[in-house]
């Protein structure tokens, strides 16, 4: 097993008397963008929490760079993986610049000014720097959370490690959806960052993911390229939706249409 991987082996998780994740095995590697899709209640957020170390499986294990997640200290793990949650509250009246600066806590004692300026620019947050975080719109807050996640993982020339995102586009308009996913895709091309994000929009997953993981009732129903996973037969069976899949002539990307 390569030390540069995050490897999950036979993960199981139960809560409230229900099995939420059952027998999931997968590998995440730097240099790729992975989309986690599936219907409501499939277990996507639970799996993300298991992969990022926020939950412990009742069976199976996750290994990051050859070591079980359970043996990493919180400080060590904070330098190697970051999580952008759907929502997060800030209890006090902090400005955006102050909120983003908090993400550099794992790197205390190292210069942060250049890093913060870089991530604020990349995420389009520089014009928000002096505003109070709690006063921002939902979409603006999502962009700030992305800036925080990138700041947490930023090393000499860019982010390194594993970045997990739970529905990062849910509050964004079309322009900012494209900008966020395009940025994540470009950052992974350097080969030092692995991105795993939950997406409800399967067309966004088709457009930007190198690999798609399709989760159904806590099990991994399919894993592969967008063309391999996003087939009519597979999507109809999983989502129970009346849909069509066509391939874009321009770039060969599958495009999913709902029928009336």
From Swiss-Prot:
Subcellular location(s) of the protein: Cell inner membrane
Chief place of localization: membrane
Signal peptide: none
Ranges in coiled-coil conformation: none
GO cellular component: plasma membrane
GO molecular function: ATP binding; ATP hydrolysis activity
CDD domains: ABC_Iron-Siderophores_B12_Hemin (cd03214)
Keywords tagged on the record: ATP-binding, Cell inner membrane, Cell membrane, Membrane, Nucleotide-binding, Translocase, Transport
Membrane topology value: Peripheral membrane protein
Binding site for ATP: 38-45
Every ABC transporter domain range: 6-242
Enzyme Commission code: 7.6.2.-
Functional note: Part of the ABC transporter complex HmuTUV involved in hemin import. Responsible for energy coupling to the transport system.
Family the entry assigns: Belongs to the ABC transporter superfamily. Heme (hemin) importer (TC 3.A.1.14.5) family.
Assembly information from the UniProt record: The complex is composed of two ATP-binding proteins (HmuV), two transmembrane proteins (HmuU) and a solute-binding protein (HmuT).
Name of the featured protein: Hemin import ATP-binding protein HmuV
The gene coding this protein: hmuV
């Amino acid at each position: 097993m390569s030390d540069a991987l995050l490897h999950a082996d036979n993960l199981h998780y139960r809560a409230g008397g229900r099995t939420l994740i059952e027998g999931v095995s997968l590998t995440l590697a730097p240099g790729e963008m992975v989309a986690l899709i599936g219907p409501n209640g499939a277990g996507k957020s639970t799996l993300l929490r298991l992969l990022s170390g926020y939950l412990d499986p009742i069976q199976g294990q996750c290994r990051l760079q050859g070591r079980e997640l359970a043996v990493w200290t919180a400080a060590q793990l904070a330098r190697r993986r970051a999580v952008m949650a759907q929502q997060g509250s800030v209890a006090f009246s902090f400005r955006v610049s102050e909120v983003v600066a908090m993400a550099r806590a794992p790197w205390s004692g190292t210069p942060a000014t250049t890093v913060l300026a870089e991530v604020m620019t990349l995420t389009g947050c520089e014009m928000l720097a002096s505003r109070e975080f709690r006063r921002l719109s939902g979409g603006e807050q999502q962009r700030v959370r992305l800036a925080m996640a990138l700041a947490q993982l930023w090393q000499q020339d860019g982010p390194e490690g594993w970045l997990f995102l739970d529905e990062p586009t849910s509050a964004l308009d079309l322009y900012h959806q494209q900008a966020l996913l395009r940025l994540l895709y470009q950052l992974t091309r350097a080969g030092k960052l692995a991105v795993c994000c939950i997406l409800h929009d399967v067309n966004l997953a088709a457009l930007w993911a190198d690999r798609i993981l399709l989760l159904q009732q806590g099990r991994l129903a399919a894993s592969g390229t967008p063309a391999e996973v996003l087939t009519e037969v597979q999507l109809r069976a999983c989502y129970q939706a009346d849909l069509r899949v066509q391939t874009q002539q321009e770039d060969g990307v599958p495009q999913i249409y709902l029928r009336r």
